[in-house]
UniProtKB/Swiss-Prot annotation:
<keyword id="KW-0934">Plastid</keyword>
<feature type="region of interest" description="Alpha N-terminal domain (alpha-NTD)">
    <location>
        <begin position="1"/>
        <end position="233"/>
    </location>
</feature>
<dbReference type="GO" id="GO:0003677">
    <property type="term" value="F:DNA binding"/>
</dbReference>
<dbReference type="GO" id="GO:0000428">
    <property type="term" value="C:DNA-directed RNA polymerase complex"/>
</dbReference>
<dbReference type="GO" id="GO:0009507">
    <property type="term" value="C:chloroplast"/>
</dbReference>
<dbReference type="InterPro" id="IPR011262">
    <property type="entry name" value="DNA-dir_RNA_pol_insert"/>
</dbReference>
<dbReference type="InterPro" id="IPR036603">
    <property type="entry name" value="RBP11-like"/>
</dbReference>
<dbReference type="InterPro" id="IPR011263">
    <property type="entry name" value="DNA-dir_RNA_pol_RpoA/D/Rpb3"/>
</dbReference>
<dbReference type="Pfam" id="PF03118">
    <property type="entry name" value="RNA_pol_A_CTD"/>
</dbReference>
<feature type="region of interest" description="Alpha C-terminal domain (alpha-CTD)">
    <location>
        <begin position="268"/>
        <end position="346"/>
    </location>
</feature>
<dbReference type="GO" id="GO:0006351">
    <property type="term" value="P:DNA-templated transcription"/>
</dbReference>
<dbReference type="Pfam" id="PF01193">
    <property type="entry name" value="RNA_pol_L"/>
</dbReference>
<keyword id="KW-0150">Chloroplast</keyword>
<keyword id="KW-0804">Transcription</keyword>
<dbReference type="InterPro" id="IPR011773">
    <property type="entry name" value="DNA-dir_RpoA"/>
</dbReference>
<dbReference type="GO" id="GO:0046983">
    <property type="term" value="F:protein dimerization activity"/>
</dbReference>
<comment type="function">
    <text>DNA-dependent RNA polymerase catalyzes the transcription of DNA into RNA using the four ribonucleoside triphosphates as substrates.</text>
</comment>
Amino acid sequence: MLRDEVAVSARTLQWKCVESRADSKRLYYGRFILSPLMKGQADTIGIAMRRALLGEIEGTCITRAKSEKIPHEYSTIVGIEESVHEILMNLKEIVLRSNLYGTRDASICVKGPGYVTAQDIISPPSVEIVDTTQHIASLTEPVDFCIGLQIESNRGYRMKTPNNAQKGSYPIDAVFMPVRNANHSIHSYGNGNENQEILFLEIWTNGSLTPKEALYEASRNLIDLFIPFLHAEEQDQNLKDNQKNGVTLPFFTFHDGFDKLKKNKKEIELKCIFIDQSELPSRTYNCLKRANIHTLLDLLNKSQEDLMKIEHFRIEDVKQILDIIQKHFVVIDLPKNKFLIGNPSE
């Protein structure tokens, strides 16, 4: 009943992009409206959306530089105009776009004289440099400029700490937020009805994604936060039915399937198959992500018992995951009835 009411009330609401522009490679702007809203709803949505845009969207950046030849962060190197600290600040500003999870290694190796720019970064295929002209260093003499880099995807902002420093390795303040700023304003609907409002939402991004993409990601993250409330009654009923029928969920691990996968002729690189390639429903996808399950390898290393410990995860989700893996990768041959919920005697 609740979902029906939500669907009916949402039919009259309309999103519209009223302005979109790219001021530079690293500055995109978009303005959107949502209307008509009842009085008070615009502020509720605007505040929640701004928080989600600034804090809930993942971004990618350089989080560490490595070189055994650098004595300390505030040193200078012969033949390089900038100090090490200035180079680290320039690396902090590099804007990256990627679909990676966790950390990856990259590097720069250039011989002077000349300029070192973002174009000189040797990165994994899953990482794209948004603006290859971003300046890193100026080499005034024929010196070798070779450093290792660590690239990471995450959310929010992370300050470097003294405890995070290692010899020859220099942490960088990480700004993972792809949304630079977000504002909302509320206006009268203009039909003489003071109880109806229009929400205007302005979004500025760093170029790693468009304002429209940011709006989609923020909306999806907010929806995922509220989905458990919509399913609460349904989950309670499933639990009562299972207890009533005396059903014991079968213990199953993905290791059998993993063994077959390793023997597959195609030798699929499990680490390169991300769960977002498998067309999982957004709720299941986000449950797995929050449990640090990002690739097919991560998934196949989990047992059903492990998966059922994930918050908001259900036995139906396990069955659905298996069905999708069988459909797309055709490597696991297990009887589907092991996952059916109900009275075994039926």
